[in-house]
Curated annotation (Swiss-Prot):
Biological processes per GO annotation: lens development in camera-type eye; visual perception
Organism: Aquarana catesbeiana
Record remark on domains: Has a two-domain beta-structure, folded into four very similar Greek key motifs.
Family of this protein: Belongs to the beta/gamma-crystallin family.
Protein name listed in UniProt: Beta-crystallin A1-2
Length: 198
């Protein structure tokens, strides 16, 4: 009997509930799509949230700018729950959007030592809490190609420091310069990387 290939898992649905007070108190609002400015919804800031479905990117500023935070399924009772081991004290979350490409079963990322996809390269298909411990000879990455899925890259080993979310459906999956990693990108120092799964 012939084996039928399963259809790809449909993208979405996504659902996130945000609160204007810590510990899921105060005003609340549910979203199933992007929000470029939480102030337009009557909030001055998001102080806690629950991700009920899908993976999301939260941003420090409106219009999807500033420090990025990956928001995966679960509860975030305070700002430090989403910034976690981030080396920077950021209590602000003003915009967010779903990560559409996080739904891929197989994730693949190629990192390059230099900008514009030049120099030694390394193909990743798994999580790496320390690139150097796994054989990458540098603490910097010049450019990256996301061939499938979505990834979060961290400035320091152990998934700490600035977070950069890279997606196969943004920039055509090609990030030829570290400044393309996000509006907050200040360095091409990347020392840990992991896949974003739904």
């Amino acid at each position: 009997m012939a084996q039928i290939n399963p259809l790809p898992v449909p993208l979405g649905p996504w659902k996130i509930t945000v609160y204007d007070q810590e510990n899921f108190q105060g005003k609340r609002m549910e979203f199933t799509s992007s929000c470029a400015n939480i102030m337009e919804c009557g909030f001055d800031n998001i102080r806690s949230l629950k991700v009920e479905c899908g993976a999301w990117i939260g941003y420090e500023h409106t219009s999807f700018c500033g420090q990025q935070f990956v928001l995966e399924r679960g509860e975030y009772p305070r700002w430090d729950a989403w910034s976690g081991s981030n080396a920077y004290h950021i209590e602000r979350l003003m915009s967010f959007r779903p990560i559409c490409s996080a739904n891929h079963i197989e994730s693949k990322l190629v990192i390059f030592e230099k900008e514009n996809f030049v120099g030694p390269q390394w193909e990743l298909c798994d999580d790496y809490p320390s690139l150097q411990a796994m054989g990458w000879g540098n603490n910097e990455v010049g450019s990256m190609k996301v061939q499938c899925g979505a990834w979060v890259c961290y400035q320091y080993p152990g998934y700490r420091g600035y977070q950069y979310i890279l997606e196969s459906d943004h920039h055509g999956g090609e990030y030829k310069h570290w400044r393309e990693w996000g509006s907050h990108a200040q360095t091409f120092q990347i020392q840990s990387i992991r896949r974003i799964q739904q």
